[in-house]
Amino acid sequence: MRHPMTFALAAAMLAVLSGSALADKYEGTKKCSSCHKSQGESWKSTAHAKAMESLKPKVKAAAKTKAKLDPNKDYTKDKDCVGCHVDGFNKEGGYTIASPDKFLAAVGCESCHGPGSKYRGIHRK
């Protein structure tokens, strides 16, 4: 082989690119709830379903004050806060501040179970 380094780089690029194309996608609790109806209904009344709401100004003011946070500040774009209040923060196909997805703006199914797309094949059997 005349150019082993070129071959190695090409192989590495192919591995990276093919891996990203196959990455599992976060789909949001609404998608999960379309089949898992009772779980979805139960989840709606939990603090997890409203996790992103607590980052808004004047919401949960006492808790924010106790945590030495400004209760009047909007924390919905604060990367140090958002990660614990949404599904798949800054992960492939997950919630991002730059392009927020309302279906991922909560602590939903995928926070524990991982990206929903990986379950499609399992559920269709």
Each language-model region and where it sits:
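N-terminal export/membrane-targeting signals
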Residues: 1-23
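Sequence context of c-type cytochrome heme-c attachment sites
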Residues: 19-105, 116-125
